[in-house]
From Swiss-Prot:
Pfam families linked to this entry: Ribosomal_L27A (PF00828)
Keyword list, A-Z: Ribonucleoprotein, Ribosomal protein, RNA-binding, rRNA-binding
Name of the protein: Large ribosomal subunit protein uL15
Domain of life of the source: Bacteria
InterPro entries: Ribosomal_uL15, Ribosomal_uL15/eL18, Ribosomal_uL15/eL18_sf, Ribosomal_uL15_bac-type, Ribosomal_uL15_CS
């Protein structure tokens, strides 16, 4: 066997059949779809169930979006251990430390994890357990 005698495996290089490109090709005009009817047309729209009432219309609408909702950026106690002992933790300091991407409507401190440092924390909201843990560690909480 020589390099110039190499041939692809039988059936591995099948030419794609281009339909709807003239009658003489054997697959022109109706392009192998037969005559009229649903199967001769293009696809049905998304969510179409053959004329039966589709699922998205059978299920009732629920709820609404409250335009006055304030979304807080949440920070757990365990994340505050990156600050030095006696430091003042402000929203700007949290953004600078990379703990929070953006402040949104403010920052809420949650009580998940342990706090091992004495910190003065300034935030929009505190959970009860977070406030207790900060004060138990000798720190202070301040609502801004």
């Amino acid at each position: 066997m020589k390099l110039n005698e190499l041939k692809p495996a039988e059936g591995s290089r099948k030419v794609r059949n281009r339909v709807g490109r003239g009658d003489s090709s054997g697959n022109g005009k109706t392009a192998g779809r037969g005559q009229k009817g649903q199967k001769a047309r293009s696809k049905t729209r998304l969510g179409f169930e053959g004329g039966q009432m589709p699922l998205y219309r059978r299920i009732p609408k629920r709820g609404f979006t409250n335009i006055n909702r304030k979304e807080f950026a949440v920070v757990n106690l365990s994340a505050l251990n990156v600050f030095d002992d006696g430091a003042e933790v402000t929203p700007a300091a949290l953004v600078e430390a990379g703990i929070v991407k953006n402040e949104k409507a403010g920052i809420k401190i949650l009580g998940n994890g342990e706090l091992s440092k004495k910190l003065t924390v300034k935030a929009a909201k505190f959970s009860k357990s977070a406030a207790e843990a900060i004060e138990a560690a000798g720190g202070k909480t301040e609502v801004i």
